[in-house]
Amino acid sequence: MELPPQIQAQLMQLQQLQQQLQMILMQKQSVETELKECKKALEELEKSSSDEVYKLVGGLFVKRKKEDVKKELEEKVETLELRVKTLEKQEEKLQSRLKELQEKIQKMIPTAQ
């Protein structure tokens, strides 16, 4: 059975939305992983009794003040948390659009037969 062009177009749009959602989910997972690493680094930094620590910069370890590194990590955590929230909002919008489109397609299919 050949689907009408209108349904085919809707199915293509559905597929594009699914791909967008997959990309958002992959980005979110990546950002969440980086966020966990930053939080773990902050935890380890808190355990250190030294005023100076070594930070990896472009393949080299550079001695830095503990407070400077801590501040950088806290800012990075804040930025990453914001990014996760943004991605979650995008994910919710895409999920909603996907659901609406699926319902629309299901309503169209019985009329096409």
UniProtKB/Swiss-Prot annotation:
Keywords: Chaperone, Cytoplasm. Belongs to the prefoldin subunit beta family. The gene is pfdB. This is Prefoldin subunit beta. PANTHER family: PREFOLDIN SUBUNIT 1, PREFOLDIN SUBUNIT 1-RELATED. Its main location: cytoplasm. It comes from the Archaea. GO terms for biological process: protein folding. NCBIfam families: gimC_beta (TIGR02338). GO terms for molecular function: protein folding chaperone; unfolded protein binding. Molecular chaperone capable of stabilizing a range of proteins. Seems to fulfill an ATP-independent, HSP70-like function in archaeal de novo protein folding.
